[in-house]
């Protein structure tokens, strides 16, 4: 949606007019105007997506009941009704998954810092740089990459993430499904950050065209959280998780030695407890070093039993695609 907001509704790679015309990006003079354009793009894309999802859910409820799923919900058993029909309250299984929130926050923070505050370039120059994947604009690219980033306990970017998510959530939660059930929202990108990134152009946060978006759902973009795990958890906790009714996914990879003693394990447990007290949601760890993962890529026959946490599920590392392996390796704390 941010790409559409910064390109007057046009998808960069295809050149198609996918969203409404929300204004020449060169005319934006402050962050509020960009966020308003983003919201318009989000709302325009949500309506047809919701219509499709309603049709999908209606078919499930009337033609393809799911007794196995129903067996896990007491209300379905009590009512004798399907999960996708009227079996559960107050939701009917429809969730809007948000992917790339940290990229959005990083991008808006970079625009605020580099364009509006430092005036290192104007919006027209930024728009042209994005269109050409920063060809010939390496200095501007570096300045955008040096701007504040999500995951470092910095209010100037963390509160942008909170604000964008709040506005999107408030819009989604006004809607209802075909059987009058409330819609839910969650930062649960799973592993779609890789294919989604492939169809997107460059972004103001310094991500180049075709590169993956931030993974998991709410995890900082790889390599940008440079202030330690406590800063990561503080950034994530600033987001109002009460609006994330379907939760969020935070992936963290730390060295195995971080839990090599009982004292270290207790410290990690205390860290997680504080995160939960701050109303953080799902956090999952990989306790494996970079050297081990890189060696597993080179010699998969030696690591057939190497399990890693992907996104709410675990898998054998050597069975994952190279792109997903690289994404897991790039995770940091």
Summary of predicted features, one role per range:
Residues 53-60, 81-86, 118-214:
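Internal maturation/activation junctions in enzymes
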